[in-house]
Every structure is written in C-alpha cells, then in structure tokens.
Amino acid sequence: MFRLVKVLNSNNQCEVSRLKIATTANFGPGCALTCSSGSLSSAAVAMMPDYISMVGSNDAEDGKIDAMFVTEDMVFKVEFTGTTAPYPGMTVGLSTKKQKMDSVTHSTTGKGMIIDVDDNPNLVYVRFRR
C-alpha cells in the first residue's frame, strides 16, 4: 500500500511541475505541510500513513510523530493544472524540505513521474524518483 499525499493550495489546485513541500516538523502522520507553487498562496495539509486530511498549520506535533522521509514508494495525489494533458509516464519536478528540531534544513530534490491519471483528469498520482 503506497502512501497518498494530496497537496492543495487555497484554490484547491497545485501545479505538479513546481510542487514544493515544506514543514517545520518531521514528516509523519498528522504533520502539517505547506504547498507553494509559483506565486500561488500556500495551504496547510497533513500527511497520513495512507490518506490525508486537511489540518491547520498549528496541528503539527514536534517530537510526537515518527520521522518519514519521502521515498520512492510514496505516491503524491495532486491536482494537475498544467497546460499539457497529463499522462502516465510524464516526468515532473518534485522537491521537499524538512527542518528538524536542530534547525538544520534537509532538502530532497528529484523527479516525479505520473503513474496514473484519476477518473477526474485533473487529478494525477505522482511517484517520487531520486
């Protein structure tokens, strides 16, 4: 079972090709994340073991969640707003940032590959690749 992360901004959409995920806590269940895409405004989302739910930015609990780095077995479910129709196999940019309690920021960048397109063609599933 892969983990789904749904990343939305205040307009309920986020362009995959410029997806950035940042958090001041370790990645883990209940962790508050922010998504920024170009000049679009950010919104807090949560990463859950299998699915996600929207949470406020103050809901992250430092020290009470297990560290979880983005790995190749994780799939991000995102709203695709690009001008080209998404298709399985399409490569998109993906970057993450993780700031630990020691205030050291750890960044992971790589490419995401669309592995599936939802029945709603604006929703795509992106698998992270280093």
Listing of model-derived features with the role each one plays in the protein:
Residues 1-130:
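Surface-exposed, low-hydrophobicity beta-strand/loop segments enriched in small/polar/acidic residues
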